[in-house]
């Protein structure tokens, strides 16, 4: 439905062209230092207008916290935050309200519910991820404050152009906090949030698609660094199962893999297995091909995840569809303001869902006191 999590729960609400969107976070312990600006900083990363490759829709996305935070700290009660929509242009959709847009949820929503908000996709719009990011901002703060866990997201592939930077090209890079700080700055200073040296080639690829009135997708890598051993459970409450559920809940996501992922099918067992050794009186893995999770439980190594993002379905090209009133085939030309690539703006959303998942399981696994910090 609209709530994710068991102990740390985030409920999102709102539609693309409604009055407002937001989230209610229940289960955050008291005494967590956090400000409205902390949440705003994360929303700014998701906000439209981030780069030349994002929608020209103008939105301030200013968050208002209504409850749950007092004198700069959480109170342990539900945290409620909202963002008012200000830049919606619903008239852009009035001409196509009876013609389902290919690649969107319009037709499925109509067939299932009968009555749905067609403006900008309503509840199925990417804009509804504002609620995810509000919840994720709180979760990020919680896991970093209590266990210094950091979540780093970046694009590794745009369309058919593969980047030259990812975790497995240099795993030791992520052992250094200074390296990570430099990486984060590099990511945020790139319009595609891509740290690869060939990111200019990726930019040209997107521009070419824009010139053709088309769109492109890509692959995002998410690294969770600092998560302790023992987070997650066997069988139906696995860490990777929860992360997969969190990510697949985002409409743009079409694929998900952990560690070596599908590449593991090509390896010998001797190549895939992460051997152990004793280092400074602790058991350490010599490699991290499993991606930080074995048996549904975190190993203590960085969790390595990759997510496939589909091309933005709203494109300016004329497409085939049908009319729900006349029940006849019809051409559709989508107006409005849309992202030629959604990948860079999905990154903070994926980071948010990863943080919510980790916070939830760390509370259930006993790593975080559910009452107070």
Swiss-Prot record:
This is Chorismate synthase. GO terms for biological process: amino acid biosynthetic process; aromatic amino acid family biosynthetic process; chorismate biosynthetic process. Keywords: Amino-acid biosynthesis, Aromatic amino acid biosynthesis, FAD, Flavoprotein, FMN, Lyase, NADP. Transmembrane segments: none annotated. Pfam families: Chorismate_synt. FMN binds at residues 123-125, 251-252, 295, 310-314, 337. It comes from Methanococcus maripaludis (strain C7 / ATCC BAA-1331). Reduced FMN (FMNH(2)). It catalyses: 5-O-(1-carboxyvinyl)-3-phosphoshikimate = chorismate + phosphate.
């Amino acid at each position: 439905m609209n709530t994710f999590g068991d102990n740390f729960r985030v409920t999102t609400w709102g539609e693309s062209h409604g009055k407002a969107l937001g989230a209610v976070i229940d289960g955050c312990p008291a005494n967590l230092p956090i400000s409205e600006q902390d949440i705003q900083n994360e929303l700014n990363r998701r906000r439209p207008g981030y780069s030349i490759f994002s929608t020209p829709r103008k939105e301030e996305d200013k968050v208002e916290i209504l409850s749950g935070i007092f004198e700069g700290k959480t109170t342990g009660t539900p945290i409620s935050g909202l963002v008012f929509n200000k830049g919606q242009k619903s008239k852009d959709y009035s001409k196509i309200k009876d013609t389902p847009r290919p690649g969107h949820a319009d037709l499925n929503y109509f067939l299932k519910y009968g009555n749905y908000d067609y403006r900008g996709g309503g509840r199925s719009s990417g804009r509804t991820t504002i609620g995810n990011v509000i919840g994720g901002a709180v979760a990020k703060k919680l896991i970093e404050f209590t266990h210094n866990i950091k979540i780093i997201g970046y694009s590794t592939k745009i369309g058919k152009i593969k980047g030259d930077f990812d975790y497995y090209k240099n795993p030791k890079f992520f052992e250094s906090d200074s390296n990570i700080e430099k990486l984060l700055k590099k990511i945020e200073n790139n319009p595609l949030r891509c740290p690869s040296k060939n990111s200019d080639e990726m930019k040209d690829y997107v521009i070419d698609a824009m010139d053709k009135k088309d769109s492109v997708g890509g692959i995002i890598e998410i690294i969770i660094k600092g998560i302790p051993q023992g987070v997650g459970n066997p069988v139906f409450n696995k860490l990777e199962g929860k992360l997969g559920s969190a990510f697949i809940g985002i409409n743009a996501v079409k694929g998900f893999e952990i560690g070596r992922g599908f590449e593991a099918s090509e390896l010998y067992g001797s190549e895939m297995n992460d051997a152990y050794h004793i280092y400074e009186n602790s058991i350490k893995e010599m490699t991290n091909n499993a991606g930080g999770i074995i048996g549904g439980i975190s190993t203590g190594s960085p969790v390595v995840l990759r997510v496939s993002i589909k091309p933005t379905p709203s494109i300016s090209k004329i497409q085939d569809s049908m009319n729900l009133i006349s029940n006849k085939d019809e051409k559709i030309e989508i107006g409005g303001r849309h992202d030629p690539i959604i990948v860079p703006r999905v990154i903070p959303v994926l980071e948010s869902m990863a943080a919510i998942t980790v916070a939830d399981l760390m509370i259930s696994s006993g790593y975080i006191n559910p009452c107070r910090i």
